């Protein structure tokens, strides 16, 4: 069973949320009506030996691990077009983690929180005989009429991607990435985004989630996807994951204006495909042949 299939079964068992929950489970954040704005809520975690490494050639400084924990959550707020405001951090750490290591871990989180004006308002700390697990819950806000969801892509929309893709582990990007809060906020406030999400599990897999949520197909140009290094292959760009870039669906007429107005010279914005009407949500190539979806799945 895939991760998405598991969650579909789980969500079907949950009570229907009240109308105050404008965005229910299944998007990058949940969203609760709060006056003229929405309160955004998301949670993400990192596991030692999976999201950062305790030993070996990719051994991770504790500051980098703590930074990554918050950065992953900031990327979810960015995907909704929101502004991050506060967070809570809960961690269970193994016996080798002395107070000095823990302080350095929290230093990494706090430094990034200061950079993004996020207040750490609470959390929990525990020990474990196993690998570290740390979870962060983030809160944010967005205007009710500007929130971006996965489900708004329309036939004819252009799919654009920020940044570059692939080779995340080899380049250290999986630790040093910049959450696209600035870019996501700009796209939301300027009204360009019909749908948006961040890429954590690979471009193909996350693009397929937009297709599923929006009930459309996507004609993707794999060769158009910007690669992180000259050595990065197309397959790596499509499936490696941990890119933490944004995928955004924009109307065909608006796409040209968006590219002309894009103010972030340090972050490329690239058209990589077009959404199509289809009976089955899927990703196809230029000839209409389905592209096998690849990416990181925690249950596969």
Segments and roles (model prediction):
Residues 1-60, 80, 85, 89, ...:
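Extreme N-terminal cap/leader segments of soluble proteins
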Residues 22-24, 40-43, 119-123, 161-162, ...:
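General beta-strand structural signal in soluble alpha/beta enzymes
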Residues 31, 73, 81, 120, ...:
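Residue-level signal for inorganic ion chemistry
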Residues 33-36, 83-169, 274:
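Glycine-rich anion-binding loops of enzyme active sites
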Residues 96, 175-243, 276:
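Active-site-proximal betaalpha loop/short-helix elements
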Residues 99-100, 147, 253-260:
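Short, conserved charged micro-motifs
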Residues 139-141, 247-251:
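Short hydrophobic/aromatic beta-strand micro-patches
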Residues 259-300:
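Acidic, Ser/Thr/Pro-rich beta/coil linker or hinge segments at domain junctions
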């Amino acid at each position: 069973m895939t991760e998405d299939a598991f969650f579909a079964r789980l969500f079907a068992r949950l009570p229907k949320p009240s109308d105050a929950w404008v965005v229910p489970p299944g998007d990058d954040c949940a969203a609760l009506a709060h006056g003229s704005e929405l309160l955004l809520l998301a949670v993400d975690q990192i596991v030692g030996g999976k999201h950062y490494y305790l030993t070996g050639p990719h051994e991770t400084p504790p500051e980098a691990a703590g930074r990554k924990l918050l950065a992953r959550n900031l990327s979810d707020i960015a995907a909704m077009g929101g502004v991050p405001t506060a967070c809570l951090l809960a961690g269970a750490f193994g016996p080798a983690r002395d107070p000095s290591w823990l302080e350095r871990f929290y230093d990494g989180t706090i430094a990034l929180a200061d950079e993004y004006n996020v207040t750490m308002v609470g959390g929990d700390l525990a020990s474990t005989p196993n690998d570290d697990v740390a979870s962060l819950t983030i809160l944010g806000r967005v205007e009710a009429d500007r929130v971006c969801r996965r489900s708004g892509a329309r036939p004819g929309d252009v799919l654009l991607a920020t940044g570059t893709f692939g080779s995340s582990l080899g380049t250290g990007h999986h630790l040093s990435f910049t959450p696209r809060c600035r870019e996501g906020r700009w796209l939301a406030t300027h009204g360009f985004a019909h749908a948006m999400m961040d890429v954590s599990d690979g471009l193909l897999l996350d693009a397929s989630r937009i297709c599923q949520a929006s009930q459309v197909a996507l004609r993707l140009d794999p060769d158009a996807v910007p690669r992180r290094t000259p050595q990065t292959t197309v397959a790596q760009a499509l499936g490696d994951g941990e890119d933490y870039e944004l995928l955004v669906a924009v109307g065909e007429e608006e796409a040209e204006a968006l590219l002309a107005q894009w103010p972030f010279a340090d972050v490329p914005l690239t058209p990589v495909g077009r959404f199509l009407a289809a009976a089955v949500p899927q990703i196809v190539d230029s000839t209409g042949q389905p592209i096998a979806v690849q990416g990181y799945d925690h249950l596969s």
